[in-house]
Structures are given as structure tokens and as C-alpha cells.
């Protein structure tokens, strides 16, 4: 097999810089990382200086993802020799156990890390990932709640907990998690959109009104969010047909739904009428508008 350096006519410095760029971008292009990284550590290890250790870690994680356990084990052994007793290296050992589906061994290892260092967030998150991989959502939820009691500012954990509650159809708790996220990220249109979707799923006039409000907020933050635009149409339409809504509320929401449908129509027209799938989409939007006109008349 041709070497990367020969195939693409690149120097080892350029390969090292590419690996750094992938780390900074948190790229999960495991095959490329393995190809470039394996050549770096086998041919140029002596030239890499202290960069060699972070590259070993990067290559090991990619190798696990790519199914190269031989390479992952080699990198792990090099790291163990250099950093015996390191919690970071122990966590990598646990990740290898996970890749081998030795989940009990991985959890025992993470528990030992946490006994020595209760603030080790990486080990806690790996335990949660295992529970999810095993389909044990209830245990993952419990672990995440315990984690958030200590690390309340971890936004990624709040979002993960919201997703787990949604999977368990516990929409009230999912909404609470998303409210926490919106308080710290008021300009994130995706959080507004997801919160609106949860309230829409909960149903009832009050939740539908909240849903419409947050779909509108998501659109205000990003006017190209088509999912929020469809959500605005759906929530406003349901409010307009809700028997508990007042006449004024019904009339107002009919206007909102009509506006949303017209915006959807414009978006599809802008995408071009030549595409077959676009024509079907346009027909669906036109049917929406026709339904609104019938309801209004």
C-alpha cells in the first residue's frame, strides 16, 4: 500500500499539521486519521517531539472507530509506558473495552477512576455512553441527573438528558432540560425549535400556544429554519381549530398559519419548480393554503 506522503506528495510536517487541524475541528474522519496517523507514528515518531503523545491518543480513538484494534492496542501500550497510572490513559483503556463490548469491565474501570477522582467528568460521561449503548435509558437518565447535580453548567449534558427524556416520552422533563438550555443560550434557534416541538407533542391549548411562540422565536433567530416554519404552520393551524380557543385567537392563528404556508410555498418555488420532488412539495403546500381558505370561508 502506497504511503500517504508519497501518494499525496506531502511532508511529515504537513501531515502533523493536518492531524492538529482535525483535532481542533473535532473531526470524526476516522479512516483518514488512521491512514495519516499510522504513517506518522511508524515513520516519523522521533521527529514529532511531545506531539507524539496526543497523536497516539488521536490515532487510538480513530482506530477503535475504524475497527483497527491492533493499531489501537499499539497506541495504548505506548501511552501506558509513558504515563503509567494516568486516569486519561485508563479512560482510553475503558474505551477499548467498550469497542470490544466488554461493558462490565469498562464500567468497573470508570468506577475505579471516579473513586480516585470524583470530579473526572470524562469517566462519568463514558459510563453514561455505555448505558445508552446497552439501551438502558433509565440508568443513563439517573447517571446524567447525578452528574448534573455536580456540573450544572454542562450544556451538552442537559441536551443529552433532554434527548433521553424524549425517547422515554417524558416530555415535561424534556421541556425542563430545554428551558435550562434556553436560559444560557437564548439565541440558539435549534433549542427554541426543539422546545417548541416538545410542547407541540404535549398538546393542549396552552402548550400549543407556547409551541407556536417558540417556533416563531426560532424563525426570528434563523429565518431559514424550515422545520420551525412548518412547526409554526402546524401549531397555529391546531390552535385555529381548537374548540377551546376564543374567536379572536382562532382568527389570529389562522393568519399565522396562512402566512407560514405562504412562506413555505415561496421557499419551494425559490428552490426551483424543475425538480420532480419539488413539484410534489409545492402541491402539498398549495393544498395547505386551499384548506386554510376553506376553513376561513
Swiss-Prot record:
GO biological process, any? tail-anchored membrane protein insertion into ER membrane
Residues modified as N6-acetyllysine are 255
Q: Which residues carry this modification: N-acetylalanine?
A: 2
Which InterPro entries would you find in this protein's record? EMC2-like, TPR-like_helical_dom_sf, TPR_EMC2, TPR_rpt
Q: Which SUPFAM superfamilies match?
A: TPR-like
The UniProt entry, under Gene3D superfamilies, shows: Tetratricopeptide repeat domain
| UniProtKB keywords | Acetylation, Endoplasmic reticulum, Membrane, Repeat, TPR repeat
The listed locations are: Endoplasmic reticulum membrane
Q: Where are the TPR repeats?
A: 87-120, 155-188, 192-225
Q: Which Pfam families match?
A: TPR_EMC2 (PF22890)
Main subcellular localisation: endoplasmic reticulum
The entry's cellular-component GO terms read: cytoplasm; EMC complex; endoplasmic reticulum; endoplasmic reticulum membrane; extrinsic component of endoplasmic reticulum membrane
Q: How does the entry describe its membrane topology?
A: Peripheral membrane protein
Q: How does it assemble?
A: Component of the ER membrane protein complex (EMC).
Q: Which family does it belong to?
A: Belongs to the EMC2 family.
Q: What's this protein's function? A: Part of the endoplasmic reticulum membrane protein complex (EMC) that enables the energy-independent insertion into endoplasmic reticulum membranes of newly synthesized membrane proteins. Preferentially accommodates proteins with transmembrane domains that are weakly hydrophobic or contain destabilizing features such as charged and aromatic residues. Involved in the cotranslational insertion of multi-pass membrane proteins in which stop-transfer membrane-anchor sequences become ER membrane spanning helices.
Stated name of the protein: ER membrane protein complex subunit 2
Q: Lineage of this protein's species?
A: Eukaryota, Metazoa, Chordata, Craniata, Vertebrata
The UniProt gene name for this protein comes to EMC2
